[in-house]
Amino acid sequence: MTDILHPILVTGAHRSGTTWAGKMLAADSETAYISEPLNVLHRPGVFRAKVKHWYQYICNENEHEYLTAFHSLLDFDYYLLDEIRSIRSRRDFLRMGRDFMVFYNALMHGQRALLKDPFAVFSVPWFANKLNCKVVVTIRHPAAFASSLQRLNWNFDFNDLLDQPLLMRDHLEKYRGEMSAIRAEDVIGQAALLWKMIYGVVYKFKEMNPEWLVVRHEDLSHDPVNRYRDLYASLGLDFTPRVEKIIMNSSSSENPGELSPKQTHSIKMDSLASVKNWKKRLPEDEINRIRKMTEGIAELYYAGEDWK
């Protein structure tokens, strides 16, 4: 595999800009955008392996469960019969058509796979070493992350992490007590703890792999054209006028600064205005709580002024 055809992995915590980053990096015809193979609810036509947990951890010891499926995915081998058997709604049918065409076009045009998958974040070393992925990790301010989850009322069941012995052993054992103690209804507390764990692990990964690209969502939002141009250059992608236009349209001040909770995956927003939304949504006591809970990790990415 030549360097230019290495797959790209865009990951980071969910609700941290991975969709926007992935879509913008796949804005031209060089790449094929594939969404969340490690989502527990992934489509069987796209990825054949069963995913048991949110934030499934993959390493050398359990790779036999996933490696063949990922090789098929990166070969753009679409399992049409599996997908047909799983169709239960018109939405499923339309999604099958979309995914089939992504795989077909990738094969016909020799495209490079771009995997957008927040749930791969703990497994980044495996993706880099076994699948030769170029890595992009997005970060979003912890208060913005918590505010987004609270607004959507998306809680997180830490049993998905606690029930993974390899993940606990390798990265998260020191957080066992905090995960066990968090209340099921405490979305803010869950978000702060999850953010601290994810980006504490990411920081260790980055220290060992300085070539990986770790980007703040806020930096992309403040200067999208230039920041994405830099990412394109680092990944060996062509930053064409068409790409620039798509990025400008996705982040324009003419777009809304706030979206309906029903538009959870929209990528057209006023990017500059949207980074400030958490300051309007969260009361001061919740901001202070998030800051305290993420202390020790948040300072690695955000200065004190970023909390004001």
Map each language-model feature to its residues.
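Hydrophobic/aromatic beta-strand patches that form the interior of the parallel beta-sheet core
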Residues: 8, 32, 134-137, 213-215
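Short His-Asn-centered micro-motif
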Residues: 11-12, 115-118, 139-140, 217
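Conserved phosphate-donor/acceptor-positioning beta-strand/loop module used by diverse small-molecule
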Residues: 116-117, 130-151
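A conserved segment at the C-terminal end of the G1
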Residues: 19-31
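Short catalytic/ligand-binding loop motif for oxyanion handling, primarily in non-cytosolic enzymes
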Residues: 22, 40-43, 121-124, 143-148, ...
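PAPS-dependent sulfotransferases, especially Golgi type II membrane carbohydrate sulfotransferases
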Residues: 1-9, 14, 152, 159, ...
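PAPS-dependent sulfation machinery
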Residues: 34-115, 158-184, 271
